Amino acid sequence: MVPVVALVGRPNVGKSTLFNRLTRTRDALVADFPGLTRDRKYGRAEIEGREFICIDTGGIDGTEDGVETRMAEQSLLAIEEADVVLFMVDARAGLMPADEAIAKHLRSREKPTFLVVNKTDGLDPDQAVVDFYSLGLGEIYPIAASHGRGVLSLLEHVLLPWMEDLAPQEEVDEDAEYWAQFEAEENGEEEEEDDFDPQSLPIKLAIVGRPNVGKSTLTNRILGEERVVVYDMPGTTRDSIYIPMERDGREYVLIDTAGVRKRGKITDAVEKFSVIKTLQAIEDANVVMLVIDAREGISDQDLSLLGFILNSGRSLVIVVNKWDGLSQEVKEQVKETLDFRLGFIDFARVHFISALHGSGVGNLFESVREAYDSSTRRVGTSMLTRIMTMAVEDHQPPLVRGRRVKLKYAHAGGYNPPIVVIHGNQVKDLPDSYKRYLMNYFRKSLDVMGSPIRIQFKEGENPYANKRNTLTPTQMRKRKRLMKHIKKNK
């Protein structure tokens, strides 16, 4: 599960500035749902290759007496769902009553909390933080988020050790594996069999979407049809529910972000939406089903979720629910709107269903299996290089400064999603249009459907670049004789 870091504190203490610092390697804004999350922002960040979700909870300006209400409205859910809390205060404003009330609440939650004193630039470090020791939160970390001072130390001494304890990184060098495979093929050696068999593992399927689109109805419809094995494995308070099931001889793990409830207790009015659960379910899934309400059409929230799914590289099946009862004219309008707003998602199957009545639900799993198979299929270096060569023969790369971009060979760089690494000269100068052409060519040639495909380019290195040739003693003697001969004949 992807770890979660929540930034809390009063307004204008610099939470958004630190949020942007932490998420600078990714798109800072992942989802912004006014009215549902009370202006909280969710972003993906990275420390030395370890990803985590960062939450900017917005300002809490309550007093000692009323802070609990304000916390419940804006930040309580984020704090409960977070693995660690960075509590930010303002060194220039000094200790405020709201700071004390927030600290009291955090101490009562027994959540790992680190006190970050911002805006310490231009102040005496010792004097700037001394008042905040009374909050009883242990060591203090002074920073100046706007200038980046102290942020690196915060990452190295707080977040990185905490993430290592929470989720130790597996010491697996996939690149070495791929290069070993490539060299073996180049030398004519037999390619070693990959021990990993994706067909032997259950497909993790996440059903996500906005509130009231029918996620729970669809979940229970799926579980109610040809159900073989169903039992709940509840995790912590912030975890989704994982439900193992079997369908048509294939094992699945259904990730329910809203929680599975008894059929009689399901009502759209009480279906709750947790952004964190949704984002974590997407990260943990192999295939994501995005459920859209046909009567409401595509919303900005749907597009935000789509953006996160694409950034995560997950396979995708789009489900348009509540299709029953619509007139033919309205159905045509809905399809036109989908084609217009989802034109950039040309690899995903779109299904029109009624979860309530079950129409179209049975066809979903064919697309789920297709998407999973496409994302996990193993393709050898020779095949990928052959496809790349055919693509170049059909449409050559453009000239760059009078020289043709040369693509040398291709190999697999990863799976789920499939990654093709292309080596060549001047590849950094390839225009985006040609990169899209290559991506579409590989997709068509490999018959990839339901899964995104990524193309990465690596520049060929000249081993003699910036190196001076060292002459041997014999070459030096020959050079001297040649120079004497040239001078003599001048």
UniProtKB/Swiss-Prot annotation:
CDD domains per the UniProt record, alphabetical: EngA1, EngA2
A biological-process GO annotation: ribosome biogenesis
Assigned protein family: Belongs to the TRAFAC class TrmE-Era-EngA-EngB-Septin-like GTPase superfamily. EngA (Der) GTPase family.
Positions with a binding annotation for GTP 2: 209-216, 256-260, 321-324
Source superkingdom: Bacteria
Domain EngA-type G stretches: 3-166, 203-376
SUPFAM superfamilies (UniProt xref): P-loop containing nucleoside triphosphate hydrolases (SSF52540)
The entry's keywords: GTP-binding, Nucleotide-binding, Repeat, Ribosome biogenesis
HAMAP family: GTPase_Der
Entry keyword annotation includes Nucleotide-binding: yes
Role noted for this protein: GTPase that plays an essential role in the late steps of ribosome biogenesis.
Coiled-coil region list: none
Domain KH-like: from-to ranges: 377-461
Gene Ontology molecular function: any one: ribosome binding
Residues reported to bind GTP 1: 9-16, 56-60, 118-121
Protein name from the UniProt record: GTPase Der
Oligomer and partners: Associates with the 50S ribosomal subunit.
